[in-house]
Amino acid sequence: MAMQTVREGLFSAPQTSWWTAFGSQPLAPESLAGDSDSFAGVKVGSVGETGQRVDKQSNSATHLAFSLGDVKSPRLVPKPHGATFSMQSPCLELGFSQPPIYTKYPYGEQQYYGVVSAYGSQSRVMLPLNMETEDSTIYVNSKQYHGIIRRRQSRAKAAAVLDQKKLSSRCRKPYMHHSRHLHALRRPRGSGGRFLNTKSQNLENSGTNAKKGDGSMQIQSQPKPQQSNSQNSEVVHPENGTMNLSNGLNVSGSEVTSMNYFLSSPVHSLGGMVMPSKWIAAAAAMDNGCCNFKT
């Protein structure tokens, strides 16, 4: 009977509450004893030494009885031989100190009683994204070596071109193309730095040149006055300075020279010339052919 009570005391159901898994401390037997009418005490009895009535139909040596009342009384809770009362789980005696209520997977050591802790953490270790392998030697196939080198060179060249484009975009050139820049340097500019319209200037210059050419052609096309005319023959006498004309006119040398100068230059504008009254009279006499003037 004593061995049976010991076995039942060792392998009885754990008396630990369900909230002990969340970190609460187990209650002491003194805290359970109190003047409370709604608290159910535990009374354990044994056959033989206690002298109480035992049901003949029950074959168990110990039984649990729940009753209301004062738990402090030692008569209601006798201590049998070989039976131990403890609020802790009997798993402590076997070496396990974990509560009966377990949590989920991240706390695997609590679920497996520390067995998994010997293997270390089971989480994945993320590798770095940029793994520098230039320092270490890389072994490749001999047939693929030249292709790998060629691709690496092309990638390096593309990266260099990209860097150059980035730098060129930062410092922009003042012109779009070098040929346009040279053409802009050759074009004439005005005082404000703007380009001059050379087409209109070329048209104006060609028009003035054409006008000048037409005037020279007109001057060249006009015949020069003849020195000797069949109708008006001139005879100059240097002694007396007089001139006899065939039509009966006698004019002094000074007047004749001035008249010849006037007649030899008909192209000049009349607005800038001042004709004396004597010259006008001589010209009228020559046209009429009936007067003789002497000075």
Curated annotation (Swiss-Prot):
Composition bias of kind Basic residues appears in 178-189
- Localization, UniProt: Nucleus
PROSITE patterns (alphabetical)? NFYA_HAP2_2
- The yes or no answer to whether the keyword Metal-binding is present is no
Q: What is this protein's tissue specificity according to the annotation?
A: Ubiquitous. Expressed in seedlings, roots, petioles, hypocotyls, reproductive organ tissues and leaves.
Listed GO molecular functions? Answer: DNA binding; DNA-binding transcription factor activity
- Membrane-spanning segments: none
Which keywords accompany this UniProt record? Activator, DNA-binding, Nucleus, Transcription, Transcription regulation
BP term (GO), one: positive regulation of DNA-templated transcription
Give residue spans, biased composition: Polar residues.
197-209
One GO cellular component term, please give it: nucleus
Give start-end positions of Low complexity composition bias. Answer: 216-233
User: Major location, coarse class?
Assistant: nucleus
InterPro entries per UniProt? NFYA
Q: Where is this motif: Subunit association domain (SAD)?
A: 139-165
For the region Disordered, give the residue spans. Answer: 178-244
Q: Which PANTHER family does the UniProt entry name for this protein?
A: TRANSCRIPTION FACTOR NF-Y ALPHA-RELATED (PTHR12632)
Write out the function statement from the record.
Answer: Stimulates the transcription of various genes by recognizing and binding to a CCAAT motif in promoters. Promotes the expression of heat stress-inducible genes by contributing to the formation of a heat stress-specific transcriptional complex with NF-Y subunits (e.g. DPB3-1, NF-YA2 and NF-YB3) and DREB2A at the promoter of target genes, thus promoting heat tolerance.
- Please give the name of this protein: Nuclear transcription factor Y subunit A-2
Species of the source: Arabidopsis thaliana
Q: Identify the coding gene.
A: NFYA2
